[in-house]
A protein has these predicted regions:
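Alpha-helical segment of the N-proximal tetratricopeptide repeat
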Residues: 6-40, 54
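Structural signature of tandem alpha-helical TPR/SEL1-like repeats
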Residues: 21-29, 33, 55-67, 89-101
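Terminal, low-structured helical/coil segments at or just beyond the last alpha-helical repeat
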Residues: 4, 8, 96-125
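Structural marker of alpha-solenoid helical repeat scaffolds
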Residues: 3, 37, 71, 88, ...
């Protein structure tokens, strides 16, 4: 049975459900076909980046978040998620930079707290 645009929408929605159900690897598998058919789909790439992060696949998560930010440099969530990825990978200076960009783009309390504007970048204070 050939894949159709509807199939990809169904796979995307199913991947969202799998990620919510804590099955990030299953989500990645579904999203691989969606992204193969629609490589420009930023929403699918962002969801796959989140799934990679949830599966502790930090390098693939980093690459996907960076690709999203190349296309949408004002995406505060992508900056925040990339910062969390860097933080988890033990790269505090890069994490702080993206936490601060996220907070500057969208002053959500969670972003502002993570940005730690009152401390030096990467100091962990």
């Amino acid at each position: 049975m050939p894949e159709s645009p509807e199939t990809h929408v169904i796979d995307f929605r199913a991947a969202e459900q799998l990620l919510a159900a804590r099955d990030p690897r299953g989500a990645v598998k579904l999203l691989d076909s969606v992204i193969a058919a629609h490589p420009e789909n930023t929403a699918a790439r962002l969801l796959r980046a989140r799934a990679f992060f949830a599966a502790a696949q930090l390098r693939p998560a980093e690459l996907e978040f960076e690709l999203v930010l190349e296309r949408e440099p004002d995406n505060a969530f992508a900056h925040f998620a990339l910062a969390r990825t860097y933080e988890r990978a033990g790269r505090p200076e890069q994490a702080t930079k993206h936490f601060r960009l996220a907070a500057a783009l969208d002053p959500k309390p969670e972003y502002i707290k993570a940005a730690r504007f009152d401390s030096a970048p990467g100091s962990g204070d």
